[in-house]
């Protein structure tokens, strides 16, 4: 079992999701070693990289939400999944539209987007809950 941590921003984003959808979302959110080594078995996982930075992406079963997360080591050396942002698909489509990007090749386009990395930076800088 993985420990999952949230920052203030991602915690607020999750709290805006109805309770039953939260349960369903996090029930299906299972991070395995394949996800962390860049060889995810589950196609719902992906990796967004830029300038040596890596963030992982999980698409919910209904393709309704995206969870963007990093993996850090805790004091015991175990992996901790740190949820940086939780975005509804509609907000992501809006982001693509406003950024002038299409929806195809989502991870590759996000990797090139300064606005996306700013969104992630804001999450990383937020205090953890």
Over which residues does each language-model region extend?
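Short non-domain terminal segments
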Residues: 4, 24-25, 43, 56, ...
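Arg/Lys-rich, positively charged N-terminal/basic patches that mediate binding to nucleic acids
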Residues: 1-32, 103-129
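A short, surface-exposed loop/turn module that caps and links secondary-structure elements
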Residues: 31-59
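Enriched for short, Lys/Arg-rich terminal
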Residues: 58-129
């Amino acid at each position: 079992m993985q420990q999952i941590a949230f920052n203030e921003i991602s915690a607020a984003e999750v709290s805006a999701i109805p309770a039953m959808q939260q349960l369903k979302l996090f029930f299906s959110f299972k991070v395995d070693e394949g996800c962390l080594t860049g060889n995810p078995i589950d196609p719902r996982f992906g990796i967004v990289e830029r300038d040596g930075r890596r963030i992982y992406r999980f698409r919910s079963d209904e393709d309704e939400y995206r969870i963007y997360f990093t993996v850090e080591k805790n004091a015991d050396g175990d992996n901790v999944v740190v949820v940086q942002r939780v975005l509804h698909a509609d907000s992501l489509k809006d982001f693509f539209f406003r950024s002038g990007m299409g929806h195809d090749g989502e991870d590759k386009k996000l990797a090139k987007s300064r606005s996306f990395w700013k969104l992630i930076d804001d999450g990383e800088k937020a205090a953890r809950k």
